[in-house]
């Protein structure tokens, strides 16, 4: 939201950046667009649907771990390892989603009057920025999938280790 500071004649945006009154547009639609963007986040975040599906998958996996614990087909120490690893992965995904997709989008020419318009075909800065952000998004998804797979492998190792130690204790 934008509010106008009556003492200095500037408009203060929700992020705290002040826009001088001379550079402010005459209509009030700009402030409503800025507040709408900052409250809803970016309209088409490239990988937000994939992250949501991945987080749902982890939540289902957590439910299956709880069912295994209830049926006691697996040792309690192994269940604790599984649940803690899955909670840690879910927490890391939530943090990553906040940092990558954020609650407020990057400023654009329409939302920030101090940004130049690089939309001409002769300038490749906008294309470069799009390519870099897409590459970083893809890399982020790949890294978190690898983190999840590594946690699954580690859980299997811990389960195997707990099974062998319990077998040794019994005999």
Swiss-Prot record:
Cellular component, GO annotation: host cell Golgi apparatus; host cell membrane; membrane; viral envelope; virion membrane
Give the residue spans that cross the bilayer. Answer: 133-153
Annotated keywords: Disulfide bond, Host Golgi apparatus, Host membrane, Membrane, Transmembrane, Transmembrane helix, Viral envelope protein, Virion
- Give the record's membrane topology: Single-pass type I membrane protein
Pfam families with a match to the protein in the record: Herpes_UL73
Chain ranges on the Virion surface side, renumbered to this chain: 1-132
Principal cellular location given in the protein's record: virion
Q: Which residues lie on this side of the membrane: Intravirion?
A: 154-171
What quaternary structure, including any partners, is listed in this protein's UniProt entry? Interacts (via N-terminus) with gM (via N-terminus). The gM-gN heterodimer forms the gCII complex.
Q: Which family does it belong to?
A: Belongs to the herpesviridae glycoprotein N family.
Q: What does this protein do?
A: Envelope glycoprotein necessary for proper maturation of gM and modulation of its membrane fusion activity. Also plays a critical role in virion morphogenesis.
Kindly provide the name given to this protein in its UniProt entry: Envelope glycoprotein N
The species this protein was found in: Elephantid herpesvirus 1 (isolate Asian elephant/Berlin/Kiba/1998)
Q: Which gene is transcribed and translated to give this protein?
A: gN
């Amino acid at each position: 939201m934008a509010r106008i500071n009556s003492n200095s004649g500037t408009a203060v945006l929700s992020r705290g950046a002040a826009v001088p009154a001379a550079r402010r547009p005459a209509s009030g639609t700009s402030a409503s667009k800025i507040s709408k963007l900052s409250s809803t986040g970016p309209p088409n975040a490239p990988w937000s649907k994939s992250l949501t599906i991945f987080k749902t998958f982890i939540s289902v996996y957590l439910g299956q771990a709880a069912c295994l614990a209830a049926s006691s087909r697996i040792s309690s120490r192994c269940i604790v390892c599984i649940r803690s690893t899955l909670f840690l992965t879910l927490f890391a995904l939530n943090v990553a989603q906040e940092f990558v997709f954020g609650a407020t989008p990057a400023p654009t020419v329409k939302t920030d009057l101090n940004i130049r318009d690089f939309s001409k075909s002769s300038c490749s800065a906008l294309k470069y920025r799009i390519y870099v952000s897409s590459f970083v998004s893809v890399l982020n998804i790949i890294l978190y999938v690898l983190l999840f797979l590594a946690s699954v492998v580690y859980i299997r190792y811990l389960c195997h280790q707990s099974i062998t130690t319990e077998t040794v204790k019994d005999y």
